[in-house]
Amino acid sequence: MVLLPLLGPVWGLSAFSGMDATPLLIATLVLSLVGLLDDLRGLPVVLRLVVQGLCAAWVLSSMDVVPQVALGVGAAVWALGLLWLVGFTNVFNFMDGIDGLAASQAAFVGFASAFLSVRAGAGADLPLLLALAGASSAGFLCWNWPPARLFMGDAGSLPLGFMLAALGLACVLRGLLSIWCLLILWAPFLCDAGVTLLLRTLRGAAILRPHREHAYQRLATALGAHRAVTLGVLAVDLCWLLPLALLAEGRPECAPMAALVALVPLLAGVVVLSLRLPADGANVKVGVCTD
């Protein structure tokens, strides 16, 4: 449902602007179908990753990623692009574990990226696509806000995460956003997913097996409420990360430091929550999340 408002406008926009959005649209639909099958019947992890990799390669090839650069540099850009698209698609999916969190973050990043790319002198295509992604996510949030009545599932989170990753990468490749800005805007998701993956790897746990060990899940269980966590992340987005993203884009020489200021406190917070709060509600007396 979260994707339906996007498809027609995106197709029309691609025809109007001359930008070929067909690979992105088809890849998004394929990933939505794969996610639906995984929701209904379960699919092997390897199959899901192969499909995601093929979709990422097709979309990346349509971006003309490495024009007039040396082959070695081109290969590195391709590898990093594939890693970003496939990796972030799964990060977004991992972070869709409590009511409202993924949809609100998608709305924030969509609108913020659209605004920042317009400030950088972008044409109409990418800002409008980003704004559409933000508006679609905000609309879905009306039903997904805690207590949620509708849920993304893999059928929604995989394609939405992929689309946002692809649009963000396109902005970076066009020079509209810096990599630092992208890291700042997605800092809550990247920090939580990265720390959780590292801790599970160090512990010898199966990193591809479903779990509820993310910091945001631990905190929601400890508080007994999804709404408090979702509102807290939104407050961090608007009061902390958005000003840092504006600084990074307005003063490029300050961008690395702005990213550091954004990431380090969040990384520290995620580590503390992950080490001090139990997963799955173990030894927590407040009960299950109710809102």
Regions found by a protein language model. Give the residues of each.
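Cytosolic, membrane-interface loops and tails of multi-pass inner-membrane proteins
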Residues: 29, 195-227, 289
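Hydrophobic alpha-helical membrane segments, chiefly transmembrane helices and signal peptide h-regions
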Residues: 56, 79-81, 134, 183, ...
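Alpha-helical transmembrane segments of integral membrane proteins
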Residues: 213, 223-239, 243, 248
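Extracellular/periplasmic helix-loop-helix junctions in multi-pass membrane proteins
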Residues: 242-260
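Membrane-interface capping segments at transmembrane-helix boundaries
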Residues: 269-286
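Extended hydrophobic-aromatic, low-complexity segments
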Residues: 176-180, 197, 208-210, 228-231, ...
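Membrane-interface starts of transmembrane alpha-helices
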Residues: 44-47, 153, 187, 224-232, ...
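"…together with the soluble PPM/PP2C metallo-phosphatase catalytic core" -> "…together
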Residues: 1-193
